[in-house]
Regions:
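Bacterial Sec-exported substrate-binding components of ABC uptake systems
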Residues: 1-34, 78, 131-166, 211-215, ...
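A ligand-binding cleft/hinge motif common to bilobed small-molecule-binding domains
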Residues: 90-100, 210, 215-234
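Alpha-helical, coiled-coil/dimerization segments enriched in small aliphatic residues
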Residues: 51-55, 175-203
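Structured C-terminal subdomain patch of bacterial secreted/periplasmic proteins
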Residues: 71, 115-126, 218-277
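Short helices/loops that flank or line small-molecule/ion binding pockets
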Residues: 73-80, 96-101, 203-215
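Extracytoplasmic ligand-binding site segments that recognize negatively charged/polar headgroups
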Residues: 93, 106-125, 163-183
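Short secondary-structure boundary segments
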Residues: 30, 88-89, 110, 171, ...
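A short, structured surface patch at a secondary-structure boundary
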Residues: 24-90, 197
């Protein structure tokens, strides 16, 4: 009898999770891992999502199974899931309960670079679809990421001067700073990040006079009008030229393909000629 050929797809090991075959039922307890599963093309494997999942639309219809901090273990057990995904470490007791129910738990922490995001997709793709197929799916995502970054860079490269961008998490001074991935992405595609010289999402009030954004991106849509009328911002070019845009910040929080789509939209919005009055 000839030896059976080894399966090129499995086993796959990522961290402390080893799968010997493709999972048929997966639960995602973080909005980020949910989006990533769909980005890779394996949304149909999800039998449950977190109560905080809002994207993509298809995920919203899936059964809700709590969150990484408070999973509904009975629902997860009943779903038959063999793999549970999240971005934060569940408690020891939760981990034990899930493992006893036959599910392995993959914690995929937030990345601090584009390469780290791509690695997260590779890890996830491998587990979901195998060493060959899953890695190929992750490469497709990587290519899409690169093309969106190129699109953003191309839009801004047509501008006469490097635009100064404020990515405002909450009015007035909580914004992307130089130490954040968001701040680094702004710089990578050709913005000057307003908070580049500062850290930890905080611009110093004492430096207000130096805050001169050409464009402002508001993570809170309802802050757009506040910003436009505010003492801090009403005098800056961004407001005078109507370059204030609301963005869906969950795209950045989730580090999904949507983040790079959003970045390209931000660049195009900035580079667009102002409408003729």
């Amino acid at each position: 009898e000839p030896e059976p050929k080894p399966d090129p797809e499995y086993p796959v090991t990522v961290g402390n999770v080893t799968l010997t075959e493709a999972p048929t039922a997966v639960v995602s307890l973080s909005p980020a891992t949910t989006e990533m599963v769909y980005d890779l093309g394996y949304g149909e494997l999800l039998v449950g999502v977190s109560e905080y999942c809002t994207a993509p639309a298809a995920a919203v219809a899936k059964p809700r199974m709590g969150s990484a901090y408070q999973p509904e273990v009975e629902k997860i057990k009943a779903s038959g899931a063999t793999l549970v995904l999240c971005t934060v470490q569940p408690t020891e007791s939760t981990l034990t309960e899930l493992q006893q129910a036959g599910a392995q738990v993959l914690v995929l922490p937030r990345a601090d670079s584009v390469e780290g995001i791509k690695q997260n997709y590779r890890a996830l793709g491998g587990l979901l679809a195998g060493n060959v197929t899953g890695t190929a799916a992750a490469e497709t995502v990587s290519t899409a990421i690169d093309s969106k970054l190129a699109e953003a860079t191309a839009a801004l490269s047509r501008m006469a001067a490097v635009p100064d961008a404020t990515l405002l998490i909450s009015y007035p001074y909580r914004m992307a700073t130089g130490d954040t991935l968001e701040g680094q992405l702004l710089a990578q595609v050709g913005f000057h990040c307003s908070g580049a010289d500062y850290t930890n999402w905080l611009y110093p009030e004492s430096e207000l006079r130096a805050l001169e954004p050409d464009v402002i991106f508001c993570a809170e849509a309802d802050e757009v009008e506040t910003v436009k009328q505010s003492y801090e911002y009403k005098v800056v070019a961004a407001v005078k030229n109507d370059k204030v845009m609301a963005i869906d910040f969950t795209a950045f929080q989730n580090q999904s393909l949507r983040m790079f789509d959003t970045l390209a939209e931000m660049a195009k919005f900035t580079a667009a000629e102002p409408a003729e009055a």
